[in-house]
Amino acid sequence: MAVPSAHEFHWQSLARLSSGRVYHSLAEVGGQLYMLGGCDAAGRPTSSLELYSPEVDQWVSLPPMPTARAGAAVAVLGKQLLVVGGVGKNQHPLKVVEVYNTEEGKWRKRCSLREELMGVAITVKDGRAFAVGGMGADLLPRSILQQYDLRKDVWALLPPMPTPRYDTSICLQGSKIYVAGGRQCKRSVKAFEVFDMDSRTWSSLPSLPCKRSYSGVLWDSTGRLCWLGGLRLGGIHQSSKFTKNVNIFDPSQGSWMRSEDTVSMKTKRADFAAAIIRGRMVVAGGLGHQPSVLDTVEAFHPEKRKWESLAPMATPRCSASTIVIRDRLLVVGGVNQIPSSAHEILYVKEEEIL
């Protein structure tokens, strides 16, 4: 299937949130979009759970979470939403775990984590959730790898990561969990490691080419890791700089592609929305060297080997929560000086939206 051209991508504004929101979590169950928690305009974690109904283009309030939280890790286990960690009302990490049954419309508290954690990454394999890393109440990163069994309601410890970290990017490929980058005490790390579920062992991979934060991290259809843009933190005598670099790791080769074989983005940016839509890497919004939040959008054309500008976002913002449902990118909330209530979708014109 040919990739869509730049002019075929269109934005549409959808029903706004009831109030500005940031650091909320999104999940899809049966094609339905759920939004959980996040911080309000005053920076307070919320307990709200909302469902977006595309048929009538509106948000519907559902029973709130028992525990208010922001930045939670959410995993979909069948028809249930598993909510793990995050930051609570006291601005401290949480250990409480809760599950929402989308068919029953009810919340249940489940077996807690062994300790309070925020910045946990999570993935699902064969009906079990795997929680990776996190930051504890002492503000130190963790190397913990935990497996949750919903039927038994129990967390099991697996061999820890070689490199402790939080806010990492993970991807499940077959029976392997790839863990790329992350942070330690607010500093970014270059560590890139993989956990083999069959042998229950960790292996180190070639490190990320440079330390940078707030990058876009994508895994394409061939299993390659694409590391886009971000903020390179300066040292004692250097200021931090936004970058437009693109780095690609090919698991089949076990190495990072040479910089001359990749194509940089048009605009330097960090903290932006990123997704792969119909075979094209897309980046939208974020922060750059400009004085205001970005509204620019660009997409990489793999055959032309260049980035092309798309129509801009209607609402410029950074720190938005995103999810791809049926090859449509939904960008929900975020920040433009204050938390935003904007909710927009990027889709290819030849298709019907949602």
Kindly label every feature range from the protein language model:
Residues 1-354:
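Kelch-like beta-propeller repeat domains
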